[in-house]
Amino acid sequence: MAQPSNYWKQDVLPLSILMLTLVATECTIGIIASGIVMAVNAVSWVQKKAISITTRILLLLSVSRIGLQSIMLIEITSSIFNVAFYNSVLYRVSNVSFVFLNYCSLWFAALLSFFHFVKIANFSYPLFFKLKWRISELMPWLLWLSVFISFSSSMFFSKHKFTVNNNNSLSNNICNFTMKLYVVETNVVNVSFLFISGILPPLTMFVATATLLIFSLRRHTLNMRNSATGSRNPCIEAHMQAIKETSCFLFLYILNAAALLLSTSNIVDASLFWSIVIRIVLPVYPAGHSVLLIQNNPGLRRTWKHLQSQIHLYLQNRF
C-alpha cells in the first residue's frame, strides 16, 4: 500500500486536502467505471445463462478493482485524519488486502491481454495454432492460478512492522507544515521477492502480449494498405484505433507496476514529494483502464452514456 514515511497534523492542511481530493476523484471514477463493467457483464451472464472467458475475466477484474479503489479511498482518508490507523490491526488487514487486490488486478489484466492476443494475432507457428485451440480450456485454470499466486505473495505483508520515531520531525518551508516521521524497514531481499513473485510475471506477460499484438496489427494494417483501392478503409481505421488503445493500455500498465513496486517496497518513503506522487499515480491505472474498456465496448459505452444523462438530469432537478 502507499506508505509514505511522513504523516502530518496541523490546523490547515492544503496539500493533504488536495491529495485527498485527487485520489478520491480518481477512485470514485474508477469505482463507477468498474461497477458498470461488472453490472453489464453480470447481466449478460444471467441473460445468456452461460459465461464466456472474456466475461469471466472482466467480472473478476472489475470486482478486484472496486475492492482495490475502495481500500485506497479508506486508507488515504485514514492516513490524513487518523495517524493511529497505521498502528492498528485494521491497517495490516487493509495492507494485505491492498497488495492482494493489486496483484489480482495485474494478473487479470495480463490474462485479458494474453487472451485477446491469442484470439486476434495471426502468427504461422504450430505452437501458436495449438494455443489458439486450447486457450478457452486453459484460461479458467490460469485465472485460479493467478489468484493463488496473488494470495500467497500478499501474505508476505501480513508481518510488515513499522519502526515509529515519534521524536523526529521535519519542517517543510514550502508547504509550511510539520511532518511526523514514520520509518519503514525494508531491504533488498524483500524488494526482490516482492517484484519477482507478484509484479514481474504479470508484467512480463502483459508487455510481451501487448507488444506482439501491436506488431501483428501493424503488419496486418500495412498489408491492407498495400492492397487497398479506396482512400478510406474502415478495417484499417479499426486496426489503427486498436493499436492506439493497446499502446495506451501498455503505458498505463507499466506506470502502475512501477508505482506499485515503489509503494509497497517503501523505496521512496524518505521523500515527501515522491510519496505523494505515488499515492496520486496508483489509482490512475485501474480507473483509466476501466474507462477505456467502456469506451471500446458498445454495450458498456451505452450504459455509461445513460448513467451520465441520469446524473445530469438529477443535478438539473436538484439545483
UniProtKB/Swiss-Prot annotation:
Those parts of the protein on the Extracellular side are: 1-16, 87-97, 159-194, 269-273
Read off the InterPro entries from this record: GPCR_Rhodpsn_7TM, TAS2R
**According to the UniProt topology, which residue ranges lie Cytoplasmic?**
38-65, 119-137, 216-247, 295-319
Q: Which Gene3D superfamilies does the record match to this protein?
A: Rhodopsin 7-helix transmembrane proteins (1.20.1070.10)
- What is the primary gene name for this protein? Tas2r39
Identify the domain of life. Answer: Eukaryota
Membrane topology is: Multi-pass membrane protein
Extra information: Several bitter taste receptors are expressed in a single taste receptor cell.
Q: Which GO terms describe its biological process?
A: detection of chemical stimulus involved in sensory perception of bitter taste
How is this protein named in the record?
Taste receptor type 2 member 39
Identify the SUPFAM superfamilies for this entry. Answer: Family A G protein-coupled receptor-like
What residue intervals traverse the membrane? 17-37, 66-86, 98-118, 138-158, 195-215, 248-268, 274-294
The protein's job, in short, is: Putative taste receptor which may play a role in the perception of bitterness.
